[in-house]
Amino acid sequence: MSTPTLTLSEDRLLPRESSALAAAREIYRSTKGLPIISPHGHVPVSWIADDMAFSDPTSLLITHDHYVNRLLHANGVDLEDLGVGRKTMSEEDNRRAFRILCEHWRDFAGTAMRYWLVDQLVGIFGITDRPSPENADRIYDTIAERIAQPDFRPRALMDSF
């Protein structure tokens, strides 16, 4: 059985009505290369200011994203299991938290968090397998490998966008 995949549609945030879609595509085409200036983010600002390498997939995608950890908590997950309020987590704790995210993937259906996570998985990390308990460790390892590379440091990523 093949693993369900994730994809990114160029039209994913555009209206569906045909005349509006054509106009939106033109606006997007003419502006997509411009920089985004936004004070909003879900990682500690010191990571960007100090250009610190991301330590692990869990702290990057789960622990510091209050939307993600609140949705998981609303579905019965203890915040401490996601690293919230903890100063340190072991490698196994980080993997366990990432497995929890993958086990609860269905709970993100129809949410902005799902959109953001898919955009990050596919668009930044090149991961097209839909997260599940069966592939959680493989996805974790792929992200961990990528964030260890200089091209995935915070400022390098910002420059790439």
Describe the residue ranges of each PLM region:
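Metal-cofactor-binding active-site regions of metalloenzymes
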Residues: 2-35, 41-161
